[in-house]
Amino acid sequence: MKTFPLQSLTIIEAQQKQFALVDSICRHFPGSEFLTGGDLGLTPGLNQPRVTQRVEQVLADAFHAQAAALVQGAGTGAIRAGLAALLKPGQRLLVHDAPVYPTTRVIIEQMGLTLITVDFNDLSALKQVVDEQQPDAALVQHTRQQPQDSYVLADVLATLRAAGVPALTDDNYAVMKVARIGCECGANVSTFSCFKLFGPEGVGAVVGDADVINRIRATLYSGGSQIQGAQALEVLRGLVFAPVMHAVQAGVSERLLALLNGGAVPEVKSAVIANAQSKVLIVEFHQPIAARVLEEAQKRGALPYPVGAESKYEIPPLFYRLSGTFRQANPQSEHCAIRINPNRSGEETVLRILRESIASI
């Protein structure tokens, strides 16, 4: 299996992301204000908690955008809010010709959107379809929807922008792991889950053009729809640690890749790194033992399933079946392959669990 994973940040680059975020926090939270627990409710004149507004300003600065909004519903809620701000029910949405992420498909169906599909790996085909069918907006997933995807996000967005097609990027699994996210590459808005970035449960973010963000804010009238100040502060507290933690994790994956392909575990046929959806190792065995390896691995401390996909709760390594979109693209692979995400563990822990699990079969 040949894959085209996204380029991870180096440790030095990740540190610079962290430092820039902290610098922005200092600009918006003078004195001891960052040490508070956050406020609640609809502050007069803001119609949201004051601390939440400041956190949103920090996020906008961090991602070089005009504005940002925190929303309920994690990554799915962010995508829903973004699409609703860009499109009216029944309009046409351009997507990559690949399996659509299941929760995103639900949003598409709820809005009654008509899908226009094209292979984003082929820029000439993309340009032709955009010119001929004139979609009302485009949804571009930053990470890979199928193993063979190789498109460069900035190139896809440049093609859409040249044609005047508004674009929303699903930046889940990419934020603070790569140099730039969608709104920094030409998308109108980026959407992502803060839960995946060591933040609080159920909080998502939309970052990008002010006019789109203002349309989202207009829907957040009631107090119950707000992200409260305490939740917003949790977003920043988690986000600060995300770039370096994920860079360390990427280094562990790279070393595991070399070890596994170098024969460290004889039962392993091959290993590749893929964004499926998180950046993980896809480990293929010579024999169809995937299900049994997963069963044994959890007895030895491996996580058997994700919580929020790299959330603050996921510390041991994850040994899990291939993602739904990858299985849909390669139905036979699930019997001989698994995905491994080191999370906060080192390569020796992953190798020990893998070897012991295979030996027990």
Curated annotation (Swiss-Prot):
Biological process terms in GO annotation: L-homocysteine biosynthetic process
First and last residue of the signal peptide: none
Superkingdom: Bacteria
Name of the protein: Uncharacterized protein YhfS
Record-annotated disulphide pairs: none
GO MF annotation terms: cysteine synthase activity; pyridoxal phosphate binding
Pfam families found in the cross-reference section: Aminotran_1_2, YhfS-like_C
